[in-house]
A protein has these predicted regions:
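GST-like domain detector, emphasizing the conserved glutathione-binding G-site
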Residues: 1-133, 137-138, 142
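GST superfamily/GST-like fold recognition
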Residues: 145-150
Length: 150
């Protein structure tokens, strides 16, 4: 059975799972869902009700980082293989974006929901992105001239 990927096109976690599958040349059946109308088939295999969900015959991966790890178990062509220190840095950056950046981004984009000043949160997001830009420059990618998962 070809794995089935349940995804939502604008979800950043689903986006990074899709990107990893594409970079690793992994084939799957893509099922785009609407978050307000989740298919029963998806909820049967993952009761969390969040995307992404990658369904195999005998297992289910319902966290984007697990999907990325699975996709990269075998080296992908033209994708940078991390050294130990690069892998640690990449995990730190993923954590930064999943926690601190996401926190401020939500409060910037949806300030009326949170009753916060969007300008303060926009400034925090900008600082995080500027620090990332310093790590990248002058290279096109974080770890040099080769594309990587980060």
């Amino acid at each position: 059975m070809t794995p089935i990927l349940y995804s939502f096109r604008r979800c950043p976690y689903a986006m990074r799972a899709r990107l990893a599958l594409i970079l690793a040349s992994k084939k799957c059946e893509l099922r785009e869902i609407l978050l307000k109308d989740k298919p029963d088939e998806m909820l049967k295999v993952s009761s969390k009700g969040t995307v992404p969900v990658l369904q195999f015959t005998n297992k289910v991966l319902d966290e984007s980082l697990d999907i990325i790890s699975w996709a990269m178990e075998s080296p992908a062509p033209n994708v940078h293989i991390y050294t130990e220190s690069e892998e640690l840095l990449s995990l730190e950056l993923v954590y930064l974006f999943d926690s601190k950046f996401k926190y401020h981004l939500d409060r910037y984009k949806y300030s009326s929901r949170y009753g916060t000043d969007p300008g303060d949160h926009q400034a925090e997001c900008k600082t995080i992105l500027e620090n990332l830009d310093k790590k990248i420059n002058p290279n096109p990618w974080i770890f040099g001239t080769e594309i990587s998962l980060l």
